[in-house]
Each structure stands twice: as C-alpha cells, then as structure tokens.
Amino acid sequence: YETGKKMTALADKVADEGYDAVFLMGVGGTWDELMQLEYLMNKFGDRDLEVYLIHAAEWNAMGHKRMTEKSVVLTASESGTTPEVLEAVKKMKEKGIRVYAMTKPEGPIGQAVGAENCVKMASDHGNGGCEMGYYLADCFGLRLLNRRGCFPQFDKFIEQTKDVWTHLVDIRKSFEPRAEELAKKYALAPYTMFIGSGALWGETILFSMCILEEMQWKRTRYITSADFFHGTLELVEPGVPVFLFMGEDENRKLDERVRAFLNRGVTGDTDINIIDTAEFAIPGLDDEFRVI
C-alpha cells in the first residue's frame, strides 16, 4: 500500500508535466505483466489516450515512431539487471525521454533512470512476485487515467485493495489441495495447453513460459480464446491436458465459447480443467474492480 503511494506520486508528476503517449516496456515476464495494464488503460481511457506495450528487445532493434521527448515510459525489472531493458533505458535517457522503473534503485537499471524515478518491486521479505508488479503498475497507470478524468473511482480502488495481499494468500491456501492434485496428475505430460483472454492473457503467457517452460522445462502451448478455433482446437486430443483460465471482463464470452466446445466431449480429451476467477472471492472488493 505504501509502495503504491510512491507509484501514484510518480504518476502525478507525469500528469503535471504532461505527456503525449504512454509506453509500457518489458521483456519476458515483465512484458507479460504489463499487458494487463495496457488492457486496463485502453478499457478505461479516453479516445485521445495513446498507450503502447513495447518489447525492450524489439525497441532496441527497431524503435517506435510515436515515441518522442514528450512521451513517458514505464518499465520493470525485479533483478535490476535485465540486459534488454538496461540497453533500452540508456538509449531512451540519451534521447531525453522520461523513464520510470519498478526496480531496485541500486541496480544498473535503477542507476540508469535515477533513484528518484524508481520504486522497488520486491517486498521486504525478499521478493514481490507478480502481484507486486501488477499492483504497482496499476497504481501508476490508473492514476494517470484518474488525472485525465477517466477513472474517478481511483481512491476507492486503492482503499479497497489496501489489504488484498492477505486475501490473495487465503485464496492460495484454499486452492492448494487442487493444485497438488493437478500437479501430480500432469507433471509428466508431454505438453500442456493453456487458454486465456483479456485481462488474463498476459498472465496466461507468463505462467506458461516463465513458470513452466523456464523454471520447470515443461512444454506448453498457450493460445487466446479468440484464436483457439483457428487451428489450435485440432491439437486437443486424448492425453493432452488443457487449462482454460476464465476471466470476468468483456472477453468472458470468448472463454465461454471455448468451455462449451471443450465440455462437449467431441475431442475425446477428458483432461479438461477450468479455472474461473469468478469462483474466488476477495472480501470488500466491489465487482467493478474484480477485472483489475
């Protein structure tokens, strides 16, 4: 909560100075995480707001024509050493572009952007996890929207998420038995398919690529609910574990179409798993904020 206030203050600084476009820059997991904020800023923003999600490695190779000295960049690196991000940040600073980072001030990236433009991503116990990255980015992006008159419920959102960390731990504890069951059942599967959409799509990629592929060397196939019917459905067959992450935003109807197909049984695949965020309550959080 207190760290979030620092991100809010940085957003206020940007709003006071003015900007022509917002760039959210990551690589790997941070790119995946920032996808959620891109979705939210486009969902709640006005038609004149320009928000771009950019990949640091791609920006280093080709730049971006809409980025000017009036633009603002938000990036992240929990380690503070991500090579692609560091290279991009240095180039951006040379061009006079404002860069703010969720990273440790003493790290190379933190030093490049300046300690006053950093907010530490890790918690006091050594790590922040994805939730910290999402929360801090949302504090920054939603505050910018609030200053534009697009998200008047900002203060209410911040107040209602003040103790969200405790509730997230409770959700994990309640899901642990099912998680253990799924892990034992599918640990040795040749590959696993993950499907998601909307606000959950970035997290779907992150879980597949960073948690399973990078950390556990598990083969995965991740696909959006929107694209599932344009090729990937042909790969659903007996013995292939399929996980559908169902969200609560406008794209839920796309998830529901996928669920209906999977549950028809026409593929012969019985390893179908539905994880629906609507089944996990967060006390004190209004329905309008659940998509966030």
Each predicted region: which residue ranges?
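Glycine-rich phosphate-binding loops that contact phosphosugars or nucleotide phosphates
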Residues: A15-F154, Q160, F245-N273
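Structured C-terminal subdomain patch of bacterial secreted/periplasmic proteins
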Residues: T267, A278-I292
